[in-house]
């Protein structure tokens, strides 16, 4: 299996373990870029204004899919960005939230996890704000769907 595919398929636990193992920020930065390279490209027809995440300096798109119980659906996400490091951040956000019930997503504070692994403090303020915008959008969607 190509290295990039393994990275994309990595669970959040694997990403956390890899971050802990990589104690140098430069190595972590390269790892985030590798995660982004492994992220499947979002189809052009999904790069719409409705899917664009506001508050990101780079262009970021998130697409939400739901399945299962309409009162607490399982949510999965597709995403993409026009910037390498941000694509990696998208991959981490997707690993954090995809495949979980809406109620769990709404309650999950990804920034607690991101801080624990040393991700947030090493990002520029623009990237950190963009990451917050992605997380906020996903959690808000989950709150609406969990309440439906």
UniProtKB/Swiss-Prot annotation:
Family annotation (Gene3D superfamilies): 3.90.1010.10
Disulfide pairings: none
PANTHER family named among the record's database cross-references: SUFE-LIKE PROTEIN 2, CHLOROPLASTIC, SULFUR ACCEPTOR PROTEIN CSDE
Family: Belongs to the SufE family.
Protein name: Uncharacterized SufE-like protein RHE_CH01250
